[in-house]
Amino acid sequence: GGFYNVVTKKPTGNTKGSVTLNTGSFDLYRGAVDLDGRITKSNKLIYRLNVAGQKKKFFTKYNNSNRLVVAPVLTYNIDSLTAITAEYTFQGSSYLSNGNYTFSPKEFADPGIANDFFYGDPGMEPGKLRDHSAYLYFDRKLNDKWKFHAQAAYFNFDMKATSTWLNYMTAEGSMPRYYSTADEHGENKFGQFSFNGEERTGTIRHRILAGVDYGNKKFWGDFSSLLPVIPGDPLNVYNPVYG
């Protein structure tokens, strides 16, 4: 419970690694590397590194999406009862359109509109998303029944993207579109600590969790329509000409 829960691959202290490659429909290519090991022979300092990248297109024309994730984790085992773990995650993404809308002047599932019809425009600037996350964990085993856990997190998010939207549609399937842009930034700070354990009263076992959460969330967003109507001929859903 609490403000946030994050599940990331943690160091195990065992030296191992893996490489994964995938491919699929619509020019999907995905690769991932997972490295797990120790920096000191005593296993006091251990690490985990995950890197993944993806490049793909869509069933609609022109649309595409590229992603990159880098997630290093470092754990310092102070002693057999105490550990500190630091994590960082970077997520980067670029895409032409986050979604695709199809409009028809006739009916739902209009057979005259191609399945790969793209509502946006290949001449648009791709949207870019950058997300940084940092975590710090402290764990202490107090005795055989009780544990103390503390964690802090910092999130930093930026997104800049453009999009097109329908103004109206004619009976012939032409739709003048307007052009808009979005510039977003988010910054979140979280803290949490808890005691977790159990006690008995006679034959009854009590499992106890007590803690405190702190959160501070900030978001800035600027959304505007740059052009009330995109210059040039309106896009026609039956014969789309882009540019």
Positions of the model-derived regions?
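Outer-membrane beta-barrel transmembrane domain signature of Gram-negative proteins
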Residues: 9-34, 203, 212-243
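Residues on the lipid-exposed face of transmembrane beta-strands in outer-membrane beta-barrel proteins
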Residues: 33-37, 72-76, 136-140, 191-197
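Outer-membrane beta-barrel channels and translocator barrels
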Residues: 40-42, 77-81, 143-145, 196, ...
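Acidic/polar loop-and-plug regions of large Gram-negative outer-membrane beta-barrel proteins
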Residues: 54, 58, 71-141, 147, ...
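Internal hydrophobic scaffold segments of catalytic domains
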Residues: 80-96, 198-231
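Solvent-exposed loop/turn elements at secondary-structure boundaries
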Residues: 105-114, 182-188, 192-194, 198, ...
